Structure formats: C-alpha cells, structure tokens
C-alpha cells in the first residue's frame, strides 16, 4: 500500500512503513 499523508491512514494501510 502507498503511504498516505495522514499518519493514521498510513499506519492502518501500510503498517506505518513509510
């Protein structure tokens, strides 16, 4: 999953792997 600007969304969809 791509990293979102929103850290919460990034964590949910990308396991905070930005």
UniProtKB/Swiss-Prot annotation:
UniProt KW keywords: Disulfide bond, Secreted, Toxin
Modifications made to the protein after synthesis: Contains 4 disulfide bonds.
Location in the cell: Secreted
GO-annotated cellular components: extracellular region
Superkingdom of origin: Eukaryota
Tissue: Expressed by the venom gland.
Keyword Nucleus set for record: no
Main localization (coarse): secreted
SS bond partners: none
Pfam families: Toxin_28 (PF08115)
Its biological purpose: Insecticidal toxin. Causes flaccid paralysis followed by death when injected into Heliothis virescens larvae. Does not induce any toxic effects when injected intravenously into adult mice at a dose of 1.1 mg/kg body weight.
Family per similarity comment: Belongs to the neurotoxin 16 (SFI) family.
The record's note on its domains: The presence of a 'disulfide through disulfide knot' structurally defines this protein as a knottin.
Protein name (database record): Mu-segestritoxin-Sf1i
């Amino acid at each position: 999953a791509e990293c979102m600007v929103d850290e919460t969304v990034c964590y949910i969809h990308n396991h905070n792997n930005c």
